[in-house]
């Protein structure tokens, strides 16, 4: 009687299942993923970036930096629930700022809302425009939250421009709790992009744009900081 080999002996050894592309990229750093790098610009200055240069007419170190717009949620004095952030020019291309967390800034009970803390970082980074004498807006901002910030506490912020390449400004900031040397509560890296006045006149609400353009001081300042893309 002839023996027939079992069917399992004729089957090739099972190959490991191929890992789906999404799983293959899951452990890669975000900025190394092809689909991410196309959509989100890197926060790391490229090799040909250059050090930022403080403008000769920038505010002197220690000088208060005036609000760029009175209704700004970050620095505007007429914004009732704003941060009322106060900034001063530092040495080099650096600014320091501070704001006190009010009850209107709560997220969790008795704690600053995370979005408010991001706003404080963003506002301090935007204040670097005064030192560079340019108009730029946030293109990307990445924040690390390191500890809770209670209502009634003061956040001491420091922002600096790290590198420039064309219209791109690479910068970073941190916020310390209750003193300039206190524990770091939040930190950020950001990419700002230089723009012209058209950026605001094209996208802003007409009423506010009209009022801003009728303010001679604000209009003069905007024109002085304007750059060509």
For the regions a protein language model found, what residue spans apply to each?
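Short beta-strand micro-motifs enriched in acidic
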Residues: 88-90, 160-164
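Short amphipathic alpha-helical face segments that pack within enzyme cores
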Residues: 116-120
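Catalytic strand-loop segment that frames the active site of acyl-thioester-processing enzymes
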Residues: 3, 66-112, 227-229
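Hydrophobic beta-strand-centered segment that forms part of the acyl-chain substrate-binding groove
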Residues: 4, 41-43, 123-157, 162
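A generic structural signal for short beta-strands and their flanking turns/coil linkers
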Residues: 81-83, 93-97, 135-141, 153-155, ...
């Amino acid at each position: 009687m002839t023996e027939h080999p079992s069917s399992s002996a004729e089957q090739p050894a099972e190959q490991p299942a191929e890992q789906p592309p999404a799983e293959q990229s899951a452990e890669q750093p975000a900025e190394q993923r092809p689909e991410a790098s196309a959509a989100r610009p890197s926060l790391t200055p490229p090799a040909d970036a250059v050090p930022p240069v403080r403008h000769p007419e920038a505010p002197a170190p220690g000088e208060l930096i005036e609000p760029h717009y009175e209704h700004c949620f970050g620095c505007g004095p007429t914004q009732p629930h704003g941060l009322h952030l106060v900034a001063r020019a530092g040495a080099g291309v650096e600014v320091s700022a501070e704001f006190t967390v009010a009850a209107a800034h709560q997220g969790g009970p008795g704690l600053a809302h995370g979005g408010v803390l991001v706003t404080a970082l963003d506002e301090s980074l935007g204040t670097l425009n005064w030192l560079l004498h340019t108009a730029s807006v946030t293109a990307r901002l990445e924040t690390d939250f390191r500890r809770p910030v209670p209502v009634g506490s003061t956040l001491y912020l420091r922002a600096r421009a790290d590198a420039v390449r064309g219209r791109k400004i690479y910068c970073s900031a941190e916020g310390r709790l209750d003193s300039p040397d206190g524990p770091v509560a939040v930190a950020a890296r950001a990419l700002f992009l230089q723009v012209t006045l058209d950026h605001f006149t094209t996208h802003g609400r007409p009423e506010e744009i009209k009022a801003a353009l009728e303010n001679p001081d604000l209009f003069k300042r905007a024109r002085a900081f304007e750059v060509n893309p």
